[in-house]
Amino acid sequence: MKKHSARVAPLSACNSPVLTLTKVEGEERPRDSPGPAEAQAPAGVEAGGRASRRCWTCSRAQLKKIFWGVAVVLCVCSSWAGSTQLAKLTFRKFDAPFTLTWFATNWNFLFFPLYYVGHVCKSTEKQSVKQRYRECCRFFGDNGLTLKVFFTKAAPFGVLWTLTNYLYLHAIKKINTTDVSVLFCCNKAFVFLLSWIVLRDRFMGVRIVAAILAIAGIVMMTYADGFHSHSVIGIALVVASASMSALYKVLFKLLLGSAKFGEAALFLSILGVFNILFITCIPIILYFTKVEYWSSFDDIPWGNLCGFSVLLLTFNIVLNFGIAVTYPTLMSLGIVLSIPVNAVIDHYTSQIVFNGVRVIAIIIIGLGFLLLLLPEEWDVWLIKLLTRLKVRKKEEPAEGAADLSSGPQSKNRRARPSFAR
């Protein structure tokens, strides 16, 4: 099995969270080798002190990552659930899902400026915008961002990004947000299947089981409301959105690999530029053909549109750059936790019926998503854990028998001197 460096090689498409482009930076430094004095030091109190300090430092670093992980999970959950609910609310006054998609995608332009502000505030070696831009452009090749690269390596992802968001928003019009958020979690299963076929990722039986659970959950979700036209169309739209998202992710790994934070920020900003230059004509056509029509611009709920765009931008920022402070698995949990949040909101704001079939479908899809979060070496870790437990169980009876056998002997030894007197 191939083991990759965190900086040099791309993450497995299935191991990284949904739509994550970035890889871990700053972990390539080798551990400091012990000096001659440390090598000759006796394994005594000093060595034990150093080991305890290392363990304490390690535990503190892990606790810090877990703390940040909880914060990131809450941010991912709230931004994803909030954007979904706000989109549902927006469609009551503004029935234009593609226009909403176009408007929100334009905000992607802010990725690189926000990244550069963070770079100036945090980095010790500050670079100008031009220098940083040129350095990030190396991600696209030796020639940087040329017109050919723009149309061959950026434009297809811009189309997939737009389709993913449009299909998701259009599905919100047809079915409730709980079903939409649950079905979109099948994205992870589609990523595994595509990465197994296209990227030749390692075959894992548990992930095949997870993919089967996801497909079974989709079928059960369709059956939950009966085979009505709106329900079937809505479910088909969400599944198509999850498929576009999976295709986007796997193609990115195949064509571009993994990006550093600056490179990912530049790439996402380029998607925003592509959206402004080439997708703007579509909302205009939809408006004049009255497919997505509004009487006047004063009737547009600008607050809802801007709120949705900010929440979606926050979600993508945290999901793509949260890997700097915590584990990717914890970030993925935020998407799963948005399901009960949407369910509670739907329970009080809509006429959703949580019958047995729907609840089982939600549980099955959620279980499949969680199984896909298992690391590739999970079976090795499980075997080691079971082996340790067996060894401990064998040692405990042996220690108990040793204590029983040593008890009478010690009493006899203590009694002999007093008996001699």
UniProtKB/Swiss-Prot annotation:
Expressed at the highest levels in the adult cerebellum. It holds the Pfam family EamA. It catalyses: thiamine(in) = thiamine(out). GO terms for biological process: thiamine transport. InterPro entries: EamA_dom, Solute_c_fam_35_mem_F3/F4. Belongs to the SLC35F solute transporter family. This is Solute carrier family 35 member F3. It comes from Homo sapiens. The lineage of its organism: Eukaryota, Metazoa, Chordata, Craniata, Vertebrata.
